[in-house]
Amino acid sequence: MKPQPFTLELSNCQLRHDGGAADKDEVRMVNVRWIDGFMVNSVSNENAGYLANTRADGASHIFLALSTNDNNTLNKSNKIVPADPQQNRVPLVEKAVDGGIFTYYIGYVTPAPEKATSGPLTSWATWELVYN
C-alpha cells in the first residue's frame, strides 16, 4: 500500500465548550465515523473494508483501502473498515480559530498482485460527523 493523505476540514465551528470555567478548555466530542462504502464482499478479515472499483472497464484485482496513517503495511491497527463500530479513528487537530482537521490516508491494495490489471479505479465511501 502506498498511502496518500487527504483531509476533512471543519470550519466555523466551536470546538471548545463555552460553559463555566471548569469546562472552558475541554474539547467537544468531535469525530468522524465511516458508515458505508462500495466494499468488496469480505471473505476474510484481511479484505474487510476494501473499497471495490465501480468501473467495469477499469483496473481489476486491485482495491482502495482507508487508513489512519501513512504506513505501507495495512493491518488491524491502522485500517479503517466502514460501518465497523470498533473502527480505528484519527485525532482532530485544532486550527487556531474555530475549526479542525482530520487527516486520513488512502492507498491501493491487492490480495493477488499477479492478477492485477491496470486501468481507472473509482470507488466511494461515506462518512458522518459526530459532534456533541
From Swiss-Prot:
InterPro entries the record matches: Adhesion_dom_fimbrial_sf (IPR036937), Adhesion_dom_sf (IPR008966)
Disulfide topology: none
Principal location: other
Subcellular location per the Swiss-Prot or TrEMBL entry: Fimbrium
Domain of life: Bacteria
GO CC, alphabetical: pilus
Keyword list, A-Z: Fimbrium
BP terms from Gene Ontology: cell adhesion
Role summary: Appears to affect the stability of the intact fimbriae on the cell surface.
Official protein name in the record: Protein MrkF
Organism in which the protein naturally occurs: Klebsiella pneumoniae
Lineage: Bacteria, Pseudomonadati, Pseudomonadota, Gammaproteobacteria, Enterobacterales
